[in-house]
Amino acid sequence: MEIHSRRAIKDDIRGIGKVHVDSWKTTYKGIFADEFLENITYEQREKQWENIFQQEDKSKYRFVAETSDETIIGFIDGGVERSGAYNCDGELYAIYLLQEYQGMKIGQKLFQSLLSACINNDMQSLLVWVVTNNPSKNFYEKFNPEKIDTKFLERVQVEETAYCWRDINNIIM
């Protein structure tokens, strides 16, 4: 099965929204409340992504992974670090991959695309917030980031951990 990655475009919103919902429901089962996950809809996520794409600027880097029949099976979203609090240039905002495609190095391909975009735009470091109980945090940890913070999100009752790669040129895939 051939999977390739490319820059995301507005026409990808429906596919990105579907991956976002489906991957949340599998990734966060048992971490977020069932009721919370059950109430996430494709329509909500599509609207969220429409808003994100409307705010498009040159400091945002978005890529999708798709099958040979152009079905989107994953995405990554990143850009300039949003808080300014962690002395990091860039931030990985989100990366999601449908469960059946995990473990096939597709996430690494997406991550490499984001890293290349950041490096090409003179960024040296990258921040990511990860739900602490998310087993997928191992994906980030294998690239040896520095753990720099934690915070508790009251609204959804979960803890997040912030990781930073201080020199993204040294991340080895």
Question: What residue spans do the PLM features occupy?
Answer:
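Conserved hydrophobic beta-strand within the GNAT/NAT acetyltransferase core sheet
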Residues: 92-95, 126-130
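Conserved N-terminal entry element of GNAT/NAT acetyltransferase domains
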Residues: 1-14, 169-173
